[in-house]
């Protein structure tokens, strides 16, 4: 009889723990959906390099968020395409571009990252660069 009571108690505890884990909501976050994002093209004009990408960002927050984006391209510095490995998404006037993310949804953007040209018109690869997302307060 004791074994039966212990077994039921353990079973109850295990089921309770599983139910509490299942009901936990995922942490709010903003991240790039790499399966829906890709490098598109690059272009050199005068002393600037324009890296074009299609970026899909997931916003799991309950409210709208505004973010800025930057790309990290160390191979393109080594190759001689870029002077700096971190380049930002900029507007035509040169100011940093802000992206508004709707709550609890995927948001897709065509993004142009702009960096300083280092002299060699050769891209290291055509992979999506590492993307940094910064929430604007």
Question: What do the PLM-derived regions correspond to, one by one?
Answer:
Residues 108-137:
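Terminal connector regions
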Residues 84-119:
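Intrinsically disordered, low-complexity Pro/Gly/Ser/Thr-rich segments with frequent PxxP/GP/PP motifs
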Residues 55-57, 113:
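Hydrophobic beta-strand positions in extracellular immunoglobulin-like domains
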């Amino acid at each position: 009889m004791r074994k039966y009571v212990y077994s039921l108690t353990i079973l109850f505890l295990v089921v309770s723990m599983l139910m509490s884990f299942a009901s936990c909501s995922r942490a709010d976050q903003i991240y790039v959906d790499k399966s829906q994002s890709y490098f598109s093209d690059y272009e050199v004009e005068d002393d600037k390099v324009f890296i074009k990408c299609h970026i899909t960002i997931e916003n799991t927050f309950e409210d709208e968020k505004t973010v800025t984006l930057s790309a990290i391209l160390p191979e393109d510095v080594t190759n001689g395409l870029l002077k700096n490995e971190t380049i930002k998404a900029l507007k035509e006037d040169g100011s940093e571009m802000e992206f508004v993310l709707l709550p609890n949804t995927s948001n897709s953007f065509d993004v142009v990252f702009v960096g300083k040209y280092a002299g060699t018109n050769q891209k290291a690869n055509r992979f999506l660069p590492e993307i940094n997302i910064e929430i604007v307060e």
